[in-house]
Amino acid sequence: MLPYPQIDPVAIAIGPLQIHWYGLMYLIGIGGAWWLASLRVQRFAPEWPKDKLSDLVFWVAMGVIVGGRLGYVLFYDLAAYINQPSLILQVWKGGMSFHGGLIGVLLCSWIFARRNGKSFFELMDFIAPFVPIGLGAGRIGNFINAELWGKATDVPWAMVFPTDPQQLARHPSQLYQFALEGVALFVILWLYSRKPRPTMAVSGLFAVCYGIFRFIVEFVRVPDAQLGYLAFGWLTMGQVLCIPMVLLGAGMIAWGYRREAGRAPA
């Protein structure tokens, strides 16, 4: 068993002002994605002035934060937030939904694309390779918060999390997700997108890979207490949301390549 590193969730405290690691991880993720996007933006939109990428990052960040929080409220714990709406603003305590954040990003990106005369799907293909940076940073934030831990296990790398009332050795599922949704997904998308691909192929690959990775990790992750398992004694809300994501992503890839083949000269 590995010891859980005792990390104060508050990274910086200046008087009554507290800056939490959870929030810092989101800033690091957004900043890292911004920097990587700046390396490729000229290939995607050579006509853009320098501040246009900043505008895009702002819109995407708003989609992540607002969509992620509202998605968690709607998908995972609606009753609690209806009873105490002020909890919605307490984002430093955790409670962000990837699928809600994805919906928020899609909506904000659609608005941005319309305003700037860009194809929505081409914009999604540009954004997709940078998303794992934010996902990975967010999972580290979950780990520091000692939340979203896994099931009890006897694997050598199991950990006892201080927030676990049972104090059992558990899978560090946040680190599994960091490795898959952050590192592995970034490598796959970064390498795949180095060459021109059919429209929707890169974003479709993101949807497929994320959905598969998340579906797998959910088997060792403890479901949200207020929901539990939805069916069969193992199906979680995260898995339910990933199934249409994988199917849609596969359809996007197939459609993109079929459309590209139809354009090829005979």
UniProtKB/Swiss-Prot annotation:
Q: What is its EC number?
A: 2.5.1.145
- So where does a 1,2-diacyl-sn-glycero-3-phospho-(1'-sn-glycerol) get bound? R139
State whether keyword Transmembrane helix applies: yes
Spans through the membrane: 10-30, 56-76, 87-107, 120-140, 172-192, 200-220, 230-250
Q: Which GO terms describe its molecular function?
A: phosphatidylglycerol-prolipoprotein diacylglyceryl transferase activity
A Gene Ontology biological process noted in the UniProt record is:
lipoprotein biosynthetic process
Kindly give the membrane topology term recorded for this protein.
Multi-pass membrane protein
Q: Which UniProt keywords apply?
A: Cell inner membrane, Cell membrane, Membrane, Transferase, Transmembrane, Transmembrane helix
Q: Does the keyword Membrane apply?
A: yes
Chief location category: membrane
Pathway participation: Protein modification; lipoprotein biosynthesis (diacylglyceryl transfer)
Which Pfam families does this one have? LGT
- List where in the cell it is found: Cell inner membrane
Cellular component, GO annotation: plasma membrane
Which enzyme class, named as a word?
transferase
* Purpose: Catalyzes the transfer of the diacylglyceryl group from phosphatidylglycerol to the sulfhydryl group of the N-terminal cysteine of a prolipoprotein, the first step in the formation of mature lipoproteins.
PANTHER family assigned = PHOSPHATIDYLGLYCEROL--PROLIPOPROTEIN DIACYLGLYCERYL TRANSFERASE, PROLIPOPROTEIN DIACYLGLYCERYL TRANSFERASE
Give the family per the record. Answer: Belongs to the Lgt family.
**What NCBIfam families has UniProt attached to this entry?**
lgt
What name is this protein filed under? Phosphatidylglycerol--prolipoprotein diacylglyceryl transferase
Q: Which gene encodes it?
A: lgt
